[in-house]
């Protein structure tokens, strides 16, 4: 659609700048399993692996279980729980949030907000609010492209500051019925509240099964 072209060009320029100026490049891969339960409830299990240092060394692996409930058509609430293993530590993360998706075929618009708490041994818990907006464009029955932006806010009694933002673009490919491949690129800047920020390229792939 013609009115999306300037937006895609802007995102492309930002991502191109990110690729050239990033401090590191990571790879993210995952496999997911999703099923629908009675009463409009969805259950999802994801297993992920992430590499850092120009995709040459282990960063983390994680297992995540998520349950979601569709309140009305397009509106959901969800609670994901994640257990992540790093080289020298483990982290547990629990989130709660909601999303709303509006279809305007062949486009769809989605807004998601969630509150996230991360626990780590001998460290104070880390609380964040994450807000994400995405636009999907259905090219044909099997192919869908998307762009998205996400901001992270530190959340405590004393401050509510931006700590990270991400810009992503990618493709969702329907391989077979109820099987989907996702290929994406993300540019993120983290530690915005610190004196030195990190700019990171992320190249990712995910495979999802629905039952």
Where are these regions (language model features)?
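Predominantly the C-terminal beta-signal and adjacent terminal strand-loop region
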Residues: 147, 158-211
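Sequence/structural signature of outer-membrane beta-barrel proteins
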Residues: 48-54, 74, 82-88, 116-122, ...
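Cleavable N-terminal export/targeting peptides
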Residues: 1-23, 210-211
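Residues that define the transmembrane beta-barrel architecture of outer-membrane proteins
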Residues: 25-29, 59-63, 90-94, 125-129, ...
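Residues on the lipid-exposed face of transmembrane beta-strands in outer-membrane beta-barrel proteins
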Residues: 31-35, 65-69, 96-100, 131-137, ...
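Start-of-domain marker
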Residues: 21-78
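Detector for outer-membrane/organellar transmembrane beta-barrel domains
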Residues: 99-102, 106-153
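Repeated loop/turn-to-beta-strand initiation elements of outer-membrane beta-barrel proteins
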Residues: 39-45, 73-79, 105-109, 141-145, ...
């Amino acid at each position: 659609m013609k009115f999306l072209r300037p937006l895609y060009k802007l995102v492309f320029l930002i991502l191109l700048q990110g690729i050239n100026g990033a401090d590191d490049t990571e790879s993210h891969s995952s496999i997911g399993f999703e099923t629908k339960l009675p009463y409009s409830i969805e259950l999802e299990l994801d297993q992920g692996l992430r590499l850092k240092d120009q995709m040459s060394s282990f960063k983390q692996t994680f297992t995540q279980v998520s349950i979601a409930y569709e309140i009305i058509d397009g509106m959901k609430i969800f609670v994901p729980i994640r257990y992540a293993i790093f080289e020298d530590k483990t982290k547990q993360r629990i989130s709660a949030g909601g999303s709303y998706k509006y279809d305007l075929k062949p486009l769809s618009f989605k807004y998601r907000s969630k509150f996230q708490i991360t626990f780590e041994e001998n460290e104070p818990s880390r609380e964040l609010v994450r807000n994400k907006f995405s636009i999907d464009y259905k090219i044909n029955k099997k192919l869908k492209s998307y762009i998205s932006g996400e901001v992270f806010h530190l959340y405590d009694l004393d401050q509510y500051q931006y700590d990270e933002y991400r810009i992503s673009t990618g493709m969702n490919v329907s391989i077979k019925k109820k099987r989907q491949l996702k290929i994406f690129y993300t540019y993120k800047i983290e530690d915005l509240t610190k004196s030195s920020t990190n700019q990171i390229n992320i190249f990712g792939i995910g495979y999802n099964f629905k039952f």
